[in-house]
């Protein structure tokens, strides 16, 4: 392409051309040769566009003003073109071009010839000198392509343009993803796996031109790059990421590589500094490292902990080691004592073999668990009362804690009761070895021996209580006596021999009258038919109080008051004023009567047995005796209750059926005197007859009486024979009192 300084196509005089060049140079003093070439090339294409669109006048004016370089044609050719209006081919243009090495005289001749062609209106303007020529014009073709692509970005345009834009958008997405991966890898330490981070780019102008980054700049950037600069660089990367630039330019790629290299250098330097800081500290604390790395075995206790202790309930998780149990115990760290020493750790508290995924770790919990507080309060009665633990129990408990214990193999989910210490609760000797089974495997073999004994004793005691309640209820239904008043004290004159003798003597059921037990009798009966109570006794046959209310039966009283039967030898006639004092002086006795007896048909189907009655006894009998009368009507009975006889009252008086009826009528006419029984003034006996009523024979009768209270050992109940401590229960077995009732 010719130099724009050689204006071959302009027919201006030499002086005018020099002046014009000087003026143009003054207007554009800083334009270099490359810019002049680009501007001259654009003017040539504009001139070519005007000629091919047949804008001849505009082309002549523009060529004259812009000094466009044109081809040199002869006069004949100019005339022929004027006639035919044909254009020359691009090959002819190249061959007819004027060389830059031609002399100025020849150029002037050419310019003069071209001036005639510009001035002639008949011939078309001469064609410009172009490197690339096209039939329709290069400028118009470029414009059509640009406009089609521009419309394709908005969804319009031709199909080829749309396909081209979709392909370009996919390439941009891939380029964006690559940039994101480079950014992520640069933020992480030592991750240079991405190809853009290490590989050299073949199309990178920096690599093609052999440009390399000075290593001193990297060292300076790694040393002087602070956190703020790194943050700014990362923010710049994020901002540049939003821009849709494809493909990434060489400057961007080089910037990414520099940033990544600087970050790697800074990270490596930080790691070296961190290792240097760790090196002097590692030698000062070898004991703590040994403590955390020591594996837990089944038959060895961990050593005493030294050094600082972690926060409450912070359990460090460590990997499993050989010999460590698969399911370790859950414990918080031990608190330090006021004098600065650390108490000896319990082997159940070892956390080096803790399975990190088995139990959830509760952190920053300042309150104890609810079941732990309840357990400690149940074990220690002083905590229930809200008082302080007496100091006398502390040495004994400390003694029990200091005892050496055999190695225990940890079981699944065990939890130690010694954890109460860190909440301020006192250690009970029973909670030292208490183990909880968190997984719900209620295996008795894994329980503590003391707890196992306690559970067995509770079961045994419950069975014995049920058995005693059943036997007492059956015997009360058979004998039909009322319980003594709980307000009156137990008589000291009752002896074991008299009690056993009285219980072992029962009357035989025969057809002939037998000898009855001598006792003063006070009978209170009614002829009306009433309902039975729980003991099978008619309310009409029950003794009456002074206010007309019947006395409560033994079933209405608590079971522990059924043995309070007292001798009434010292009672006098003033007992009628206090009905509660006479409650313990009654005994149930069957007499000859025509009223139906509910005890004749007992609801309990048990084996009955006849027992002989006893003679006059020197001591009062707490167990009542039942005598059957009236063989003609075996289902009738009347209850008579009276106190036991004194030795001085030995007279036997037989009371017939008519006397009982008269007494019953008198009791109806005067309810105030008959309802409240008075003390007997003379000894009477009741002549009994045999009947078909069968007595209940229950073996091993266990009345809770004085014999049971005498045999019961309270000291053994409140003490543990193995340790001698107060455990709220004892290793005891209640006696069955087999000798209390004769077979």
From Swiss-Prot:
It comes from the Eukaryota. The keyword Phosphoprotein applies. Residues 1-36, 79-127, 264-361, 379-426, 476-692 are annotated as: Disordered. InterPro entries: LisH. The modification Phosphoserine is found at residue 89. Residues 18-28 have a biased composition (Basic and acidic residues). Residues 264-281, 501-520, 567-578, 612-631, 671-688 have a biased composition (Low complexity). Residues 98-114, 282-297, 315-353, 390-399, 408-426, 482-500, 521-544, 556-566, 586-602, 661-670 have a biased composition (Polar residues). One of its GO terms (cellular component) is nucleus. The keyword Nucleus applies. It is found in: Cytoplasm; Nucleus. Its main location: cytoplasm. Pfam families: LisH, SSDP. GO terms for molecular function: DNA-binding transcription factor activity, RNA polymerase II-specific; RNA polymerase II cis-regulatory region sequence-specific DNA binding. Residues 38-70 form the LisH domain. Probable transcriptional regulator involved in cell adhesion. Belongs to the FLO8 family. PANTHER family: LISH DOMAIN-CONTAINING PROTEIN (PTHR45093:SF2), TRANSCRIPTION ACTIVATOR MSS11 (PTHR45093). This is Adhesion defective protein 2. The lineage of its organism: Eukaryota, Fungi, Dikarya, Ascomycota, Taphrinomycotina. The gene is adn2.
